[in-house]
């Protein structure tokens, strides 16, 4: 036994970098919603960047350590304490047996990540330990952490030095207003000329209907030249669909692999981590970019 769950938080799941290369079989990628923060947590503990971590949403868990361990918290800043002592994000801490870690609410951002010095023992499916709740895949029995349950850990079989860029620009950079870079999607041309301009000049509001699968946003309704009927087509994390009501939907890491709504925009990969940190009432502005510019910006931080 390693860690006892005293309180589970709103939704705390085991995540890694996800199931890469299975979307053609209808299996979402899943993985951490903010992969930059997840990688950073592992790098700060000098672990492999794909090691499973705990992803905490809006409200974090209360965990009792049943053995000495080290841990670090990254991502959204929740009010965090070891016993009665406040601690900081992005700083590794060592705890003793019976110490209690508690995470409360975050004021900006949506998701925090907890990495441990030992490996979380969890179920693997298609080479990933990520929890996919709609099908109860991966993680700990395919479920969020449950009050009274035990998170088991084991010593690392392999140690690893830090891999890649830790994304310093993202540390503590969460806010309530987001500028998100996008590329015109395959069906962007179906929008009226006015809507093609409005989508880049308007500020959208994140609705309460947001999850790892997708985020509905509110604002100016987009309009199409004509009523359209299209076959279901491939979609991906960051695809922005627009249903008949004209209000866009941002697809997340647990989104379906096919969709029948027009794909008007595609978020640039460099801003995928922002999708995972959106919370209700946040403001979003879309910034138009090109495939070439988005690729260059991604290479600059690689």
Name each region found by the language model.
Residues 1-302:
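Conserved "landmark" site that anchors the functional core of diverse proteins
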């Amino acid at each position: 036994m390693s860690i006892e769950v005293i309180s589970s938080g709103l939704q705390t799941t085991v995540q890694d970098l996800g199931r890469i290369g299975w979307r053609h079989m209808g299996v979402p990628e899943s993985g951490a919603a903010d992969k930059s923060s997840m990688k950073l947590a592992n790098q700060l503990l000098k672990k492999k960047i794909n090691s499973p971590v705990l992803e905490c949403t809006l409200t974090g868990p209360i965990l009792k350590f049943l053995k000495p361990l080290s841990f670090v918290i990254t991502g959204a800043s929740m009010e965090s304490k070891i016993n009665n002592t406040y601690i900081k994000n992005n700083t590794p801490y060592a705890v003793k047996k019976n110490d209690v870690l508690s995470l409360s609410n975050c004021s900006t951002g949506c998701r925090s990540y907890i990495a441990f010095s030992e490996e979380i023992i969890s179920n693997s499916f298609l080479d990933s330990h990520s929890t996919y709740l709609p099908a109860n895949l991966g993680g700990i029995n395919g479920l969020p952490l449950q009050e009274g349950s035990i998170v088991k850990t084991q010593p690392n079989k392999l140690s690893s030095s830090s891999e890649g860029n830790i994304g310093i620009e993202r540390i503590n950079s969460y806010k309530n207003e987001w500028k998100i870079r996008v590329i015109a999607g395959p069906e962007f041309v179906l929008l009226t000329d006015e809507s093609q301009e409005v989508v880049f000049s308007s500020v959208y509001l994140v609705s309460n209907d947001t999850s790892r699968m997708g985020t509905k946003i509110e604002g100016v309704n987009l309009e199409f030249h004509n009523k359209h009927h299209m076959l279901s087509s491939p979609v991906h994390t960051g695809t922005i669909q627009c249903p008949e009501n004209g209000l866009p939907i941002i697809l997340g890491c647990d989104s379906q692999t096919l969709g029948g709504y027009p794909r008007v925009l595609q978020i640039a990969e460099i801003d995928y981590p922002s999708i995972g940190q959106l919370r209700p009432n946040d403001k979003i502005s879309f910034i138009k970019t090109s495939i070439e510019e988005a690729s260059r910006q991604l290479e600059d931080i690689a």
